[in-house]
Amino acid sequence: MNKEPMSMHGYNKICAELKQLKEVERPNIVKEIDIARGHGDLKENAEYHAAKEKQRFIEARIVDLSEIVANAQVIDPSALAHNKVSFGSTIKILNLDNDKEFSYTIVGSVESDPAKGLISFGSPIAKSLIGKSKGDAVSIQLPNGESDFEILDIYYKEICFDEN
């Protein structure tokens, strides 16, 4: 698997979820399964089957998060030069088709929140912008077709990761 770039915040968030799953959720579901097992015939025991399904979900999530942590590449975006679009850059772009301005910050996939302008480095928009400079024109394939954009500004600003 490829390295997964993320900020220290993203890394800590993933590690905290992984710890919660391993130390709290996994032991709790084992207890739930034991309790449900005591309720009789397992073939028709909905509580048991629901607990086993939850256990499968928890175990799969642990595997996924463990893989992300193993492949994490923690990047401090404040230490990067943002003269070209890179991880952690905030980019102001102008849609040349409709004169609308947009602002995006490129983050790791585990940190992305498009509604807040935080887009994954692996998204089509970010892939089209990475490596480009202020003033460059870029064509980006969007769900409703290709659009042309101009990069108005590239800079670094500290990202406020709101957990709400």
Curated annotation (Swiss-Prot):
Transcription regulation in keyword set: yes
Gene Ontology molecular-function annotations: DNA binding; RNA polymerase binding
Stored InterPro entries: GreA/GreB_C_sf, TF_GreA/GreB_CS, Tscrpt_elong_fac_GreA, Tscrpt_elong_fac_GreA/B, Tscrpt_elong_fac_GreA/B_C, Tscrpt_elong_fac_GreA/B_fam, Tscrpt_elong_fac_GreA/B_N, Tscrpt_elong_fac_GreA/B_N_sf
Gene Ontology BP annotations: DNA-templated transcription elongation; regulation of DNA-templated transcription elongation
Keywords: DNA-binding, Transcription, Transcription regulation
Pfam families documented for this protein: GreA_GreB, GreA_GreB_N
Keyword Transcription regulation found: yes
Entry superkingdom: Bacteria
Record family assignment: Belongs to the GreA/GreB family.
UniProt function note: Necessary for efficient RNA polymerase transcription elongation past template-encoded arresting sites. The arresting sites in DNA have the property of trapping a certain fraction of elongating RNA polymerases that pass through, resulting in locked ternary complexes. Cleavage of the nascent transcript by cleavage factors such as GreA or GreB allows the resumption of elongation from the new 3'terminus. GreA releases sequences of 2 to 3 nucleotides.
Identification of the protein by name: Transcription elongation factor GreA
UniProt source species: Helicobacter pylori (strain ATCC 700392 / 26695) (Campylobacter pylori)
